[in-house]
């Protein structure tokens, strides 16, 4: 299993390098740009004494639920969209339910007005509201984090990392 752990860590390193390269490219272009990156799920890679690996368990672990949510704005974008930039800064420490927020945040970043955009779900908006976070179980049903049977170790990880549970 050490090879599996190395493989997963290498994907994290690759993604980190890719995002850094993309940001560098956007900076060199001196473009008016915004970038949002997130992941659809986390991964267990032997993170604790349970030796869990992969994802999609009926009862996920903290490591399957905690995913990155990164927004980068170019200097030109920040200067032209001060309110959006300030809203992102205001909301940066708040918990994000990525599955609910990505669509609305991207519409907000792109400046698209539509009846489908809910500003209370956009991290790039001052109206952003913290919502309960859900896990889509193996029967395609959303379940509140406190209703999926998380283990004590996983709840402790949320608290240790100052993340809201639930």
Task: Give residue ranges: language-model regions.
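Catalytic domains that recognize anionic headgroups
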Residues: 2-166
């Amino acid at each position: 299993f050490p090879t599996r752990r190395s493989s997963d860590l290498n994907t994290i390193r690759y993604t980190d390098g890719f995002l850094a390269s993309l940001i560098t490219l956007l900076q060199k272009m001196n473009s008016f740009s915004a970038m949002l990156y997130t992941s659809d799920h986390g991964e267990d890679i032997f993170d604790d004494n349970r030796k869990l690996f992969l994802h999609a368990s009926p009862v996920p672990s903290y490591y399957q639920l905690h995913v990155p949510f990164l927004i980068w704005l170019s200097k030109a974008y920040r200067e032209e969209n001060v309110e959006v930039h300030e809203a992102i800064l205001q909301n940066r420490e708040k918990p994000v339910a990525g599955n609910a927020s990505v669509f609305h945040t991207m519409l907000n970043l792109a400046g698209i007005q539509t009846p489908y955009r809910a500003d209370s779900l956009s991290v790039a908006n001052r109206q952003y509201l913290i919502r309960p976070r859900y896990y889509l179980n193996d029967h395609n049903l959303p379940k509140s984090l406190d209703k999926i049977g998380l283990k004590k170790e996983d709840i402790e990880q949320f608290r240790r990392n100052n993340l809201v549970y639930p």
